[in-house]
Regions:
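… and, occasionally, acidic/histidine-rich disordered N-termini of signaling adaptors
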Residues: 90-268, 318-334
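Short alpha-helical interdomain "coupling" segment at the junction between an upstream regulatory sensor module
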Residues: 64, 79-97
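Allosteric cytosolic regulatory segments
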Residues: 70-77
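C-terminal catalytic subdomain
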Residues: 206, 257-269, 274-334
Length: 334
């Protein structure tokens, strides 16, 4: 009966089932004299079957019986559908709550306050495109004059990217305190991530060590958008020394570079969600706009420079939705 109803989706009345040609060969239970079966339908979808057997006084089922049972089946189908929708809504609410908690945990992993480094003003911000994201930045104190400053971007967005980013943050924090140089730290982190990350995922990373006593920044760029170093009145320098994105090749020989920081110099590190932000005509914000904003705001503090960049991106995007996570870190020597 269920198979027939699934194929035909219409009422079935059998007042003598043993002689019905449609069910030749079926071994009916001896207690079944007659039956009336109607589908329970919701928007052309079969959600159940309502069947009654053996009308009293051994009389045959009628069209009126079928009409009445069809009404009952329709009401029952709606009850079943309402119960299903309620369960789906409850599951959706539970999932939303889990994502909200994940977002809270992720935000708690970001620095809560800017680092206090003598002679420097440092700030960062991360704005996910969804409730949770795959961008993150970190300030990791090493000693009184050394601070690790890093910004990472995991491929993808949403909850999967945020879970991988949590692993990246933990890995970098662990390796920072035990690695002698920036390149060694990135190389060790890459090896660990390669072992624990699926082949279709990767991470871009800008990792740097600020020495506030020597006023130098030693950095290693693992496939990340090249940050800007604004120094003097000339063209900004792009910080591109490093190597491949993380987790692609287990043993990659990363390189590092040391740059000197003079009073007033500004380092701007950003994720591709900044430069690839588009307006309604699909025109990207681009690198040049970052240069223009920073050039006009170099006298401001690090937070002011960040606000200027974010504001310019918002103005450029207009009504276009944010498609990717946006993260910026600014280091300014006073």
């Amino acid at each position: 009966l269920l198979g027939w109803m699934h194929l035909n989706k219409k009422p079935l009345m059998l007042n003598d089932p043993r002689t019905d040609e449609r069910f030749r060969g079926v071994q009916w239970d001896e207690s079944i004299r007659s039956l009336l079966c109607v589908p329970m339908m919701v928007k052309s979808t079969l959600v159940g079957v309502l069947t009654v057997y053996n009308k009293r006084e051994e009389v045959a089922f009628t069209d009126e019986d079928q009409r009445l049972l069809a009404i009952i089946a329709g009401q029952s189908a709606q009850i079943v559908e309402n119960a299903r929708l309620y369960e789906e809504e409850q599951a959706l609410q539970r999932m939303k709550e889990e994502v909200r908690l994940a977002a809270t945990i992720q935000m708690d992993l970001l620095p809560k306050t800017p680092p206090d480094v003598a002679g420097y003003d440092i700030a960062g911000v991360s704005i996910p495109a969804q409730l949770v994201g795959g961008d993150a930045y970190d300030f990791i104190p090493i000693d009184s004059t050394h601070l690790a400053v890093c910004l990472a971007d995991v491929s993808g967005k949403g909850l999967p990217a945020s879970l991988l980013m949590a692993n990246v943050q933990a890995t970098l924090r662990g390796q920072t305190l035990s690695s002698p140089t920036a390149a060694v730290c990135v190389q060790r982190a890459n090896k660990l991530l390669h072992q624990s990350t699926s082949p279709d995922k990767f991470v871009t990373l800008f990792y740097s060590l600020l020495d506030s006593s020597k006023h130098t920044l030693t950095y290693c760029n693992a496939g990340h958008d090249n940050p800007f170093l604004f120094s003097g009145s000339g063209m900004p320098k792009r910080l591109g020394t490093g190597g491949l994105v993380l987790s692609i090749m287990e043993d990659f020989p990363y390189e590092e570079e040391v740059v000197a920081l003079s009073p007033g110099d500004v380092v701007v590190v950003y994720s591709d969600g900044i430069t690839e932000a588009v307006d309604p005509a699909q025109t990207q914000f681009g690198d040049r706009n970052i240069e223009s904003v920073v050039a006009a705001r170099r006298t401001l503090d690090a937070a002011g420079i960040i606000d200027g960049i974010v504001g310019a991106v918002r103005e450029h995007a207009g009504s276009a939705p944010q498609a990717d996570d946006m993260t910026i870190v600014v280091i300014k020597r006073k």
